[in-house]
């Protein structure tokens, strides 16, 4: 129980029990009168302790002997405050004495041999028990060998052999340059002039650009059977768009020569 607040005995035990306790005390008094030797010890046991400063007690009223054996009423009146304080003091004193005895027995039970420094494990055993798995793990990681390098397959990429030819295919003594002419070659045999726009352009290295342009144009005209002036103009526009400005003069000269070979009327001057 706390030091500030203490429970009352009247709060813990119902009122009917007080009358039973009173009858029990009366029967004990009769036994005490018959046995004078045991009364002294029992009086010491049931003696009321001195009241503390926190719990003032009223003087204990003398009990009147009554030999009535009537049963307690169903609704007995509550006892006075003096009796409550007396019972409270007895309960508090009993609890204090029992707690004191328990503490003394508990403290007495502890022998000086059982100390904290002897109960705890030594440092070496603790370090060995706790750090042994860690040390084993560290040793394992120290001796860990990495797996062998995996042999990866070579990455297959599309070769640009169709876009650019090597120097072996070109005549000896001629170097390929980045600015080689691009010649439009048709990969489909369509019979309309618009097929020249949809045809695929192939970039190849050329030593004689004029001759290569002429062969390519004649092949396109023969495959697509181009004869109309509008289709030929579209073919010329395709060649000019596919090639850089430095080859435009060569393309125009080749186109004029083919135009004359086909015996076509001259194009309308703009």
From Swiss-Prot:
GO biological process: one example: DNA repair
TM segment ranges: none
GO molecular function, one term: DNA binding
Record region (Disordered): 25-116, 181-200
Protein keywords: DNA damage, DNA repair, DNA-binding, Nucleus, Repressor, Transcription, Transcription regulation
Tissue specificity statement from the Swiss-Prot or TrEMBL entry: Expressed in roots, xylem of stems, flower buds and siliques.
Main subcellular location of this protein, as a coarse class: nucleus
GO cellular component, one term: nucleolus
Segments forming domain OVATE: 202-261
Subcellular localization, as worded in the UniProt entry: Nucleus
Induction behaviour: By the DNA-damaging agents methyl methanesulfonate (MMS) and menadione.
Pfam families on file: DNA_binding_2, Ovate
InterPro entries, per the entry: DNA_bnd_dom_ovate (IPR025830), Ovate (IPR038933), Ovate_C (IPR006458)
Motif annotated as Nuclear localization signal, chain positions: 28-45
Record's miscellaneous remark: Plants over-expressing OFP1 show stunted growth with general delayed development and shortening and thickening of all aerial parts. Leaves are irregularly heart-shaped and lobed and display curved surfaces. Anthers are short with a thick filament and style and stigma protruded from the flower. Siliques are short and uneven and produce few seeds.
Functional summary from the UniProt entry: Transcriptional repressor that regulates multiple aspects of plant growth and development through the regulation of BEL1-LIKE (BLH) and KNOX TALE (KNAT) homeodomain transcription factors. Controls the subcellular localization of the homeodomain protein BLH1. Plays a role in the regulation of cell elongation by controlling the expression of GA20OX1, a gene that encodes a key enzyme in gibberellin biosynthesis. May play a role in double-stranded DNA repair through the DNA non-homologous end joining (NHEJ) pathway along with KU70 and KU80 protein complex.
Self-association and partners: Interacts with ATH1, BLH1, BLH2, BLH3, BLH4, BLH5, BLH10, KNAT1, KNAT3, KNAT4, KNAT5, KNAT7 and KU70.
Protein name, per record: Transcription repressor OFP1
The organism of origin for this protein: Arabidopsis thaliana
Gene from which the chain derives: OFP1
